[in-house]
UniProtKB/Swiss-Prot annotation:
Transmembrane segments: none annotated. InterPro entries: Rossmann-like_a/b/a_fold, ThiI_AANH, ThiI_fer, ThiI_N, THUMP_dom, THUMP_ThiI, tRNA_STrfase, tRNA_sulfurtransferase_ThiI. This is Probable tRNA sulfurtransferase. GO terms for molecular function: ATP binding; CCA tRNA nucleotidyltransferase activity; tRNA binding; tRNA-uracil-4 sulfurtransferase activity. PROSITE patterns: THUMP. It comes from Lacticaseibacillus paracasei (strain ATCC 334 / BCRC 17002 / CCUG 31169 / CIP 107868 / KCTC 3260 / NRRL B-441). It catalyses: [ThiI sulfur-carrier protein]-S-sulfanyl-L-cysteine + a uridine in tRNA + 2 reduced [2Fe-2S]-[ferredoxin] + ATP + H(+) = [ThiI sulfur-carrier protein]-L-cysteine + a 4-thiouridine in tRNA + 2 oxidized [2Fe-2S]-[ferredoxin] + AMP + diphosphate; [ThiS sulfur-carrier protein]-C-terminal Gly-Gly-AMP + S-sulfanyl-L-cysteinyl-[cysteine desulfurase] + AH2 = [ThiS sulfur-carrier protein]-C-terminal-Gly-aminoethanethioate + L-cysteinyl-[cysteine desulfurase] + A + AMP + 2 H(+). The gene is thiI.
Amino acid sequence: MQYSEIMVRYGELSTKGKNRQAFIGRLNGNVTRALHEFPNLTIRPKRDRMHIELNGEPSDQVMARLSQVFGIQNFSPSIAVEKDMDKVHAVALQLMNETAPKGISYKVNTRRSDHDFALDTNAMNLDLGDYLTDKRPDLVVKMHQPDMILRVEVRREAIYLSTKTIQGAGGLPVGTAGKAALMLSGGIDSPVAGYYALKRGVDIEMVHFFSPPYTSQQALNKAKQLTAKLTPYVGRIYFIEVPFTEIQEEIKAKVPEGYLMTVQRRLMLRLTEAIAQQRGDLAIFNGESVGQVASQTLESMAAINDVTTMPIIRPVATMDKNEIIAEAEKIDTYDLSIMPFEDCCTIFAPPSPKTKPKTDRARYYESKIDVAGLMDRALAGVKIQEIKSSDQFMNQDQDVIAELL
């Protein structure tokens, strides 16, 4: 079946009142970026839904991209028909023959924005229902919870028919909730936290700490590839690489073993806050889950958060590890996350870190190092790269990865 357009129904936009138009405008921009590889499309955002005219572009490929755009409740591939009931009958029958298995229940649901059309919604429902009952007597009309709905939209230019409704990504259009920094490690949790941030409309930038020669180029490439895994939801994400070797060596030399992780995390948070403020970010996201590791007890979080007044948001804080893994598998980051490349969070990890560090002790040990100088030098070495979904960073590591797995 050759579809004419895809009809998009908005998600939570219906609750946004006076800001609705701004939300629709942002969604329109996000959809346009997501579908930029299909130049013949015409995208028409309306108050209650969006119409994407295919103009010959492949509907399956367009819908695959569309399914990853946040702010969409669902969408339907539709066929445009002239406002001639004989032609509407013919296309409706063809559509049902191709999509409705024998013996299922269905109903006709008509919406009419063209009130000059001869048939109102009830008359249209009855007309098409009678015709289909005559031509497909195996189908059962059922008004409540049918197996299939034949949706009909009567508009000025044509009548649109559809039988499929495909679930969208939900959430809010990315960018409508502001911009934030995400502390991205190479693990399972932080990409999932990034996914949830995007779903709530937050435009994220990745902050990743890199400690050569203790961490490898493969580890850096892995973090960039994890970023690329999330870009289909937004179009592009900035990856901010922060050199962290000198800081880790200084902490290792001057801070007692039990407080290494706490002070290291405090410096990471200080640097992330500084970068976020420079770039106009409103909050910091991370992948911490309460009690999962020593640095993620409430006492550790309190001692680490002490260095910032910026909001710290933890989308996976109350999730079990199995729940986080299931979400990582769903968004296709899990296999990449478990590749065994060391990140800077693990290379100097003490065997027995404090699970209940004291904030005053963390401050004291931190005072033993030149925080200002270390931060200045790290910030001077920051590298920023724009990452898109088509970018590949792991190709050069294929043989190594295959051997490791």
